[in-house]
């Protein structure tokens, strides 16, 4: 019985890791596609992970901004933190920063698209993207 429970737990854990790995692969592809398709301005960095427009595009493709409600955006960003950041301390920091940025940027009366861009810019400025698995792969 104990070995059955252990096997079941390990199988569930493996499925969770596989799902997160698949989501990371999709995010990587979206970032690469957005970096190729979006025009790069002269003053923008060469690294696509340092470009707000690329992050906004990739996160929009993954559905983070589908629902303009701040609570829905926070929930989706928190899922992103759990997938893209591996260190538990950095995951908590990512969740706090994204929550703060969503609160700050949704107070303004701007279009939903501009709010989404501003949220991505706020998170990028805070350094959260530097703690992601994607940044360590460079």
Swiss-Prot record:
InterPro entries for the chain: Ant_venom_allergen_Sol_i_2, Ant_venon_allerg_soli_2/4_sf, Sol_i_2/4
Swiss-Prot/TrEMBL keywords: Allergen, Disulfide bond, Secreted, Signal
Domain of life: Eukaryota
Pfam family for this entry, one: Sol_i_2
GO cellular component terms, semicolon-separated: extracellular region
CDD domains: Sol_i_2
Tissue expression as described in the entry: Expressed by the venom gland.
Residues spanning the signal sequence: 1-19
Subcellular location: Secreted
Keyword Transcription: no
Assembly and interaction partners: Homodimer; disulfide-linked.
Annotated family: Belongs to the ant venom allergen 2/4 family.
Protein name: Venom allergen 2
